Amino acid sequence: MEPLRPQITYGPIETVDNEELTEADMLSFISAAVNSTGLIGYNIKSFDDLMDNGIPQIVKQMFNVDITYKDQRDHTEIDKLRESVQIQFNFTDVNIERPQHRNYSQGNKINLLPNKARLCGLSYSGPVNLAAEVILTAHYSNGRQEVKRASIPPFQVSTFPIMRGSNRCHTHHLSKTAKKEIGEDPNEPGGYFIARGGEWVVDLLENIRFNTLHIHYHTMQQGNNEIIRGEFISQPGGAFENSSQIIIRYMTTGAITIEINSTKFSKLRIPWYLIFRMFGMTGDDSIIEQVVFDLESNSLVNTFMIEILEKSIHVLDPIFQPVQHELNREKIIQFLSEKVSKFVSNPSAYKSDENAVQYLNERQLTILDKILLPHMGQTADTRVRKLRFLGLLIHKILLVIMNVFPPTDRDSYRTKRVHGSGVSLAKAFKAIFNTSVIAPIINGFKELLKQTAFEELTQRNIIEAFSAALSKNTASDLNRSMEQSIISGNKTIMVRQRPIVNRVSTQSLERKNLLNTISALRTVNTHNTTNASKQTERADMMRRVHASYPGYICVAQSADTGEKVGMSKQLAITANVCTAGEVLSLKQRLLSDPAIQQLADVSNKDIVRKGLARVFINGEWIGCCTNAFELAQRYRMLRREGKIVHPHTTIYWDSMVDEVEFWLDVGRLTRPLLIVDNNIEKYNQACYKAAEARKKGDKDWEKHKIPFVQNTRFTSQMAKDILAGTLTLEDLVAQGICEFITPEEAENCLVAFSIIELRKHKHDVTRRFTHVDVPQAILGLAALVSPYANCTQPARVTYETNQGRQTGGWYCFSWPYRVDMNRFFQFYNEMPLVKTIAHNYVIPNGLNTIVAYMIYGGYNQEDSVIVSQSFIDRGGFAGTFYREEKVELESDIESFGKPDPLITKNLKPGANYEKLVDGFVPVGTVVKKGDIIIGKVAKIRGEKDELNKYIDRSVMYGFDEPAVVDAVMRPHGPNDEIFGLMRLRYERNLNIGDKMSSRSGNKGIAALALPTSDMPFTEDGLQPDLIVNPHSHPSRMTNGQMIETTVGLANALQGVVTDGTAFLPINVQLLSERLAQEGLRFNGCQKMFNGQTGEYFDAAIFIGPTYHQRLQKFVLDDRYAVASYGPTDALTGQPLDGKRSHGGLRLGEMEHWVLTAQGAMQTIIEKSHDDSDGCISYVCRNCGEPAIYNASHPIYKCMNCDVQADIGMVDSRRSSIVFQHEMRAANVNITSVLSPRVFQPA
């Protein structure tokens, strides 16, 4: 049988004409990639995979319960004969429906739409329906068995959170018009969850690649003699299956141990050779051969490896000393069963019973078959394959010990995976489902069998017991726990009073603008908080940009300060996350390939002596081949032609160890790259002919030579077709023009950075490229917003990625139908005169402002900016700020309404109740501080006084800034409780102290609003909107902003919009000519007049349009915090902190330094004592105990000294007094020592 070979023949690469292809045309390839997958399509796809495959697979395959317990019932003679009862049940059907909620007014269930969930504080969850089969078997002492069976029909168990936009969402496949009708943003991508009315995003989490050996040197610590360890997590399937971990350690004593981490196995470091002996390989030579492969080889590596292994076999282990030299596998298994088994409470008690010992040993082997390297098989006939694979793992560790190979690079994405919401929620679901569903069912059956005789059981009894176990409480446990796993985010949650570590990393979705929303959905977090929080070299390396990042992780975007620097990252613009592929079909194809010898047909000696390469699929060793490079290339061509393998299949040849790896597991990062073809075969043949002709003496031998040519088949016409919508990325893949490459396979590629570099080496046979890249693909969406980012200091681009997410704009198009807390809606947003490719996917969030770079009056020093008052009056950066007020009726005695002062007590003093109509201020009413905006009263139970029937619980508006009531709603909550919802609107014009930023990360603060008459102007009468300090640019190296201003000036005068995406070429000469055509200087500088004096400035001023964005840092929100009064803590009397509690700003260490340097010590005393919790305390000088003082009645008293007391007054703090009280409550007394009285002579 001949191996399958590629069939498609592509045209000669020499005939491809793409000389007209420009760098700007290459941007269309990025557009094709984004249009194909969507910016967050991978997240929705991951959740859809969980719904369609993950949850059914987990419930049906992983929760097949089979337990046997001793029967405790002894009411009758039959009960006494019954020894044990076996409970077996499995779920036969799992179905998750679209979200619903109960309509209490009609008594039925209706569809729950996303906006309804937001407004009513509901969770957007779909019903989970299960069907099951139950078998109960009674075992009697006389050998008889009695079986009871029952089929549980489908019924709702609980609900499961549904992702907005997934195939279980009501908005799935809806048209834009239909989305508008239900109050949804027609352009919103989805990808988030709605839990208890809030929007939450499940982050992408970094994880190590499963079925891969990760070798690391271990830090020598006290009491730890470990030198190096190899960690291997084995997972069959590659998506939602359970995994098992083994840790192989090499100790300073020379011992090699294996630790199996499993819930069915106690953690114990087992000598490596005992695992081989337990599986039937008893001879030391045969065991060592599994590691070194060829005992007869005389190589230095082989000899040294044998010495290490022989020494490890003879190292004394105190725990396993009784079986260290034991060759009888039954005794070894029995010894291990006594040490590590968890399924038997006292294994040593079975020693006297041979049948019990045999059962225990077989059970132990069965468990080992399932938990030891399960990806290599889980049955007894795969034990030899597992031993060979285990030997290979030890072989690789020894090579690292001998410094033949380096340890695993922990930061490389070659050995990492990125798990989306589907995998993260699957991990949480497994633990929660086991605790909240499986455990109650088992307990319910035990209780049933305890109360009812087995022979009296009916099918109805079994169904009722099954259903009763999954009652309302159980359903709420599952639903509440899944919601908590999303809301809490990576913390321990409690499920039925049991702590469960939550593996889901989430963040609240702050809708500041569309860029912020998309960036939150493309966040990749490194889940390693233990090492990240330490000041170590490892913590520093984790935060650096790794060489495997470009094209997959944005090299510019991350947090700019704090612990999240380098730990929270963003996907690059074309990067995508793969779901699991079909492994079985590819495995069958590989095993049927004649070029691959199956593992059972290859001996260890043949691998070394014949130089065979190992072949893996998802980490499973399936065989060997003679030519690894040819095998990898052949299957890559088959992938290119769309045969045999999935287009996202990873095919990687590791030349260091000569292994071919095929990967189809979940979480692989991938990105499309344009393929570069060449004529190397024709070139080699021509060179051979020329060499032969030269040998024969042919003087014209050079005519046989042909030039080497390499090029991509992507043309400018294809770029135009992509922009026209007639050509997609899938079409390019089908035509063999591009393919998907993962970080592993990228190591086998030589990628040209740009089409310019490819053309530069078009005929260079020594630099044969495999692919050509688009330079902009190394950046993420937020970094691509910055124009000419390659000309700006990288740190500034990083600042822009964070500032761009904080800018004001249109956070969504469905804002009239939403009630959001702290949302800013900017009125006027313009497309930049110098746009980038990012603006094709996000709506603009700023204005084209006329900026003059100059010093003018001293109000624009450092980061301060002078703003034209005319610009503010025209609505520059003006917008609306929204807040919400939400009040719930806590019980039946509460109601909304205007309190009647005649029968209501506890009315708020000084409050204005006159604006209330039916309990709410009408829409359009202006409310001020002291106005009651929501009226609520509670009836006093048992009150007989007709004048005090109600108590006031109304909500008073407490801000100094006036607001307009924009919307009033009275929705119903999840339990039909009524609550009032009010949206307040504020006019937020640009104020002194507000922040703004350019797209190059140059932030400024409005320091002065200058009247139009005082603003400088040009000869043409042009006045700037902003005056920016020019000294901020040389040190910050924001050259991109200078170029943007110059290009923007030419664009404004000529009425065009140009593309300023990073890495596009900048023609300085052409730009100067464009400015000259409009009568300006070549550098854009102009002569300007002083608006206050009318005189010319001595120097030409650089002025032009620059795109600026207003940051959502409003000075009006912080005014309440700068005052000498405010809310204080009821216990300590200290000022509160935070906006939610209307608290103050912290007077920190640097603020103290500033005040001290200015000699304002009294200010420090006033702020830290008088305006805080300062107070006067009284202490007895004699005993040091607190004294009693009453100012109204001059009483001075000490409980210890009585009339002998000598009481002094001390400046103290309430927090200090509270601390003393707490210490005395703990039986620890604190006394004070006061200085003695000093009497001055008269």
Swiss-Prot record:
Its EC number is 2.7.7.6. The keyword Metal-binding applies. Its main location: host cell. Keywords: DNA-directed RNA polymerase, Host cytoplasm, Late protein, Metal-binding, Nucleotidyltransferase, Transcription, Transferase, Viral transcription, Virion, Zinc, Zinc-finger. InterPro entries: DNA-dir_RNA_pol_su2 (IPR015712), DNA-dir_RNAP_su2_dom (IPR007120), DNA-dir_RNAP_su2_hyb_sf (IPR037033), RNA_pol_bsu_CS (IPR007121), RNA_pol_bsu_protrusion (IPR007644), RNA_pol_Rpb2_2 (IPR007642), RNA_pol_Rpb2_2_sf (IPR037034), RNA_pol_Rpb2_3 (IPR007645). One of its GO terms (molecular function) is DNA binding. It is an enzyme of class 2 (transferase). It is found in: Host cytoplasm; Virion. It comes from the Viruses. A zinc finger (C4-type) spans 1180-1201. It catalyses: RNA(n) + a ribonucleoside 5'-triphosphate = RNA(n+1) + diphosphate. One of its GO terms (cellular component) is host cell cytoplasm. Induction: Expressed in the late phase of the viral replicative cycle. The keyword Transmembrane helix does not apply. Pfam families: RNA_pol_Rpb2_1 (PF04563), RNA_pol_Rpb2_2 (PF04561), RNA_pol_Rpb2_3 (PF04565), RNA_pol_Rpb2_4 (PF04566), RNA_pol_Rpb2_6 (PF00562), RNA_pol_Rpb2_7 (PF04560). GO terms for biological process: DNA-templated transcription; viral transcription. The binding of ribonucleoside triphosphate to the RNA polymerase transcribing complex probably involves a two-step mechanism. The initial binding seems to occur at the entry (E) site and involves a magnesium ion coordinated by three conserved aspartate residues of the two largest RNA Pol subunits. Part of the viral DNA-directed RNA polymerase that consists of 8 polII-like subunits (RPB1, RPB2, RPB3, RPB5, RPB6, RPB7, RPB9, RPB10), a capping enzyme and a termination factor. Belongs to the RNA polymerase beta chain family. Catalytic component of the DNA-directed RNA polymerase (RNAP) that catalyzes the transcription in the cytoplasm of viral DNA into RNA using the four ribonucleoside triphosphates as substrates. Forms the polymerase active center together with RPB1. Part of the core element with the central large cleft, the clamp element that moves to open and close the cleft and the jaws that are thought to grab the incoming DNA template. This is DNA-directed RNA polymerase RPB2 homolog. It comes from African swine fever virus (isolate Tick/South Africa/Pretoriuskop Pr4/1996).
